[in-house]
Amino acid sequence: MEKSMRIKVRLLLVLITALEKVPVLVKLFLRPIANAPVISGKMKVLIRAYMGATAFDIHDVDLRNGRIGIGGVEEIMAGSIIIKLLHEILAEKMGEEKKNKALYEIGINLCKWEVSQSLGQGRWAPRVLVPLIVNSKIIDEVQSDPLMARFFKKTMNMVSRLITDEGGWGHLDFDFSSMPLKVTLVNSQEARWLPGSRKPVCHFYAGIVAGYASAISGEDLEVKEVACKSMGTPNCVFHITRKSGSRQI
């Protein structure tokens, strides 16, 4: 990483860490600013989030046209039982193995689309942050550079808070020091709706992790669920690896 970029990363880490230490200050003073009618429309999603705004604060609601989105990424809302219905109906129509592959591919394509939309709209992160978050060296950098690993983890924690935690999917925790890279999902919706399984069931969410990791790195990465709450483990754990024939993570 270039020296100038390392300086920016250090400054951002200092600022983010300082805000994390004063949650009351953030809630009482910064969140009202982040949600102010005129100012909020000109601020990036991640900036507002670090200032205490929630996903519910940041969502754009178009009542006239019946649309909702966040940072230019259009969304729809549905009951969480849709996860169970997708598993059951696709299994009935396709069989278990093809269903699992289909859900994984849906997750990949969904998340790749969301990343492309968020970057294309330019509303999620300041331009100075985009090369730090989305680049072809990111996988190697987070494993070889402790500074970059700290920064990326904090950034991913915030993105996860907005999308996963406040979106009702559960809670993600990232371990960039492990080999391979490890992602832990607490309170998985798939595991909740499909309890008592002998095999991992979170194929859709594995695809989501793979889609996001592939989109920000520019690589085709694979994700495998190695522990699943549906099987009785405390949480669901995913490993991120490069496809066979390429460099391993």
Regions found by a protein language model. Name each.
Residues 1-182, 188-203, 229-235, 241-249:
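N-terminal accessory segment detector
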Residues 158, 209-212, 224:
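Residue-level detector of functional hotspots within protein domains
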Residues 182, 186-187, 208, 212:
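Non-catalytic recognition/regulatory regions in large multidomain proteins
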Residues 203-218:
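Active-site helix/loop of acyl-thioester processing domains in fatty-acid/polyketide metabolism
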Residues 217-219, 248-249:
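Flexible helix-coil linker/hinge segments at domain or subdomain boundaries
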Residues 219-228:
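Low-complexity, intrinsically disordered Gly/Pro/Thr-rich segments
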